[in-house]
């Protein structure tokens, strides 16, 4: 898919990886709906982008993605404003082992809800023109993380859901590709949360172990994750792909050979 002229919806877009995604898409010529619960950060993000891009190229919508009604209204507003939806990036995420229900609701349930809402607008079965859905996972979705079991579970769930939903694409003829991104540690506010008891709960005493892992794996810039996003969108052969991004190996893919023949293009 060529990004130029397309309409994208990015959750968690006001800062960090989400903002890098928005900037990357805008540089490629897309129009972007900036969706975030943080009103102040969202307004500042929109204002900053307006200085570099035409103001009509972006739309900020405050939304708690864990609220199904708000999320549904957000999709409606985006399509009403831009007239279409071609790209969905389910990026919003948190790290909270203490309030683990919140972590699952935002990291996993909202991704599933967002995907189905996106399909309502993009699927050829529903009169859409097809599109691409990218879900944000993590290397924690590919391996156990003793200090963050719930965060880890949510990211594993994203991979299982994305691969399965992508497999169903050919069976359902939706015309919508789905892929996931699994970066290592990224320089965002989530890294700061590992030092807060209100986020880590009983695992706060293991913060030193996580910091040791950071030293081992290194820390990525959000812009590198945005480069991976563009690759997943533009390569029409990628469906059900799980992209890994690390400081040591850059952008590469998890190797799977488990898809039945009927699901392969």
From Swiss-Prot:
Substrate binds at residues 138, 148. InterPro entries: NAD(P)-bd_dom_sf, Sc_DH/Rdtase_CS, SDR_fam. This is 15-hydroxyprostaglandin dehydrogenase [NAD(+)]. NAD(+) binds at residues 12-20, 36-37, 63-65, 91, 151-155, 186-188. The lineage of its organism: Eukaryota, Metazoa, Chordata, Craniata, Vertebrata. CDD domains: ADH_SDR_c_like (cd05323). GO terms for biological process: ductus arteriosus closure; female pregnancy; negative regulation of cell cycle; ovulation; parturition; prostaglandin metabolic process; regulation of prostaglandin catabolic process; thrombin-activated receptor signaling pathway. Belongs to the short-chain dehydrogenases/reductases (SDR) family. It catalyses: prostaglandin E2 + NAD(+) = 15-oxoprostaglandin E2 + NADH + H(+); (15S)-hydroxy-(5Z,8Z,11Z,13E)-eicosatetraenoate + NAD(+) = 15-oxo-(5Z,8Z,11Z,13E)-eicosatetraenoate + NADH + H(+); (11R)-hydroxy-(5Z,8Z,12E,14Z)-eicosatetraenoate + NAD(+) = 11-oxo-(5Z,8Z,12E,14Z)-eicosatetraenoate + NADH + H(+); lipoxin A4 + NAD(+) = 15-oxo-(5S,6R)-dihydroxy-(7E,9E,11Z,13E)-eicosatetraenoate + NADH + H(+). The active site is at 151 (proton acceptor). GO terms for cellular component: cytoplasm.
């Amino acid at each position: 898919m060529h990004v130029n002229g397309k309409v994208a919806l990015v959750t968690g877009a006001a800062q960090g990886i989400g903002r890098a995604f928005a900037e990357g898409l805008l540089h490629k010529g897309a129009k972007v709906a900036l969706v975030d619960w943080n009103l102040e950060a969202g307004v500042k993000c929109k204002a900053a982008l307006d200085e570099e891009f035409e103001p009509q190229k972006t739309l900020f919508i405050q939304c708690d993605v864990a609220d199904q009604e708000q999320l549904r209204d957000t999709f409606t507003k985006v399509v009403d404003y831009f007239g279409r939806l071609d790209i969905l990036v389910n990026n919003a995420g948190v790290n909270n082992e203490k309030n683990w229900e919140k972590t699952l609701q935002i990291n996993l349930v909202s991704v599933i809800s967002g995907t189905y809402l996106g399909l309502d607008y993009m699927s050829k079965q529903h009169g859409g023109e097809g599109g691409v859905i990218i879900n944000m996972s993590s290397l924690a979705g590919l391996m156990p993380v003793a200090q963050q079991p719930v965060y880890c579970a949510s990211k594993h769930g994203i991979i299982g859901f994305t691969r399965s939903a992508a497999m169903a694409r050919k069976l359902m003829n939706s015309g919508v590709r789905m892929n996931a991104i699994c970066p290592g540690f990224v320089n965002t506010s989530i890294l700061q949360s590992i030092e807060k008891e209100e986020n880590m709960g009983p695992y706060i005493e293991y913060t030193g172990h996580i910091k040791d892992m950071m030293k081992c794996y290194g820390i990525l810039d959000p812009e590198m994750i945005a480069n991976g996003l563009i690759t997943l969108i533009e390569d029409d052969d990628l469906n059900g792909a799980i992209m890994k991004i690390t400081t040591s190996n850059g952008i590469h893919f998890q190797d799977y050979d488990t898809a039945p023949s009927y699901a392969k293009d």
